[in-house]
Regions:
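Short glycine/threonine-rich catalytic loop with a Thr-x-Gly-x-Asp
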Residues: 79-97
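Ribokinase/PfkB-type carbohydrate-kinase core domain
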Residues: 1-79, 86, 102-107, 111-116, ...
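Short alpha-helical functional segments enriched in proximate histidine and acidic residues
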Residues: 121
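Buried hydrophobic packing segments
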Residues: 97-98, 118
Length: 135
């Protein structure tokens, strides 16, 4: 429950953000995600099997480890890289996704970029911060 806000507050924030054309990004381990309408939700494959409720209007991205990510039934594979440490790979993926999405609002391109960021991250030990020169 780290950093979690109440479901009613999450709904209010999501609805207000939609009115203001502000995207909402969610990375939650909660099984009830229905309080995040209009959000772009990122969960991993293990978490996806436990989800009990989703909002009415949402985009769902499921990360599937070395197989990449799935969105709208489309698999976006990653590059085959030598993996040293997966710690922080999901966070690196979502940070890369958000960065790319805020630049051009294209989910497909953003997932591809996020996959490349995660691939760079896992080639390093620990929670690696991807730098511009890594790209």
């Amino acid at each position: 429950d780290k950093g979690y806000i109440s479901p009613s507050a999450a709904r209010k924030i999501s609805k207000k953000a939609k009115k203001e054309h502000i995207p909402v990004f969610v990375d939650s381990k909660k099984t009830d995600l229905s309080c995040f309408p209009n959000a772009i939700i990122k969960i991993n494959e293990k978490e996806s099997k436990k989800v009990k409720a989703l909002p009415e209007d949402y985009e769902l991205i499921i990360t599937v480890g070395k197989s990449g990510a799935i969105w709208n039934g489309i698999n976006f594979p990653t590059k085959d890289v030598e993996v040293f440490d997966i710690c922080g790979a999901g966070d690196s993926f979502f940070a890369g996704f958000i960065n790319s999405y805020l630049m051009d609002f294209n989910i497909e391109k953003s997932i591809e970029f996020a996959n490349s960021i995660a691939a760079i991250s896992v080639k390093n030990f620990g929670t690696y911060i991807v730098k511009r020169e890594d790209l």
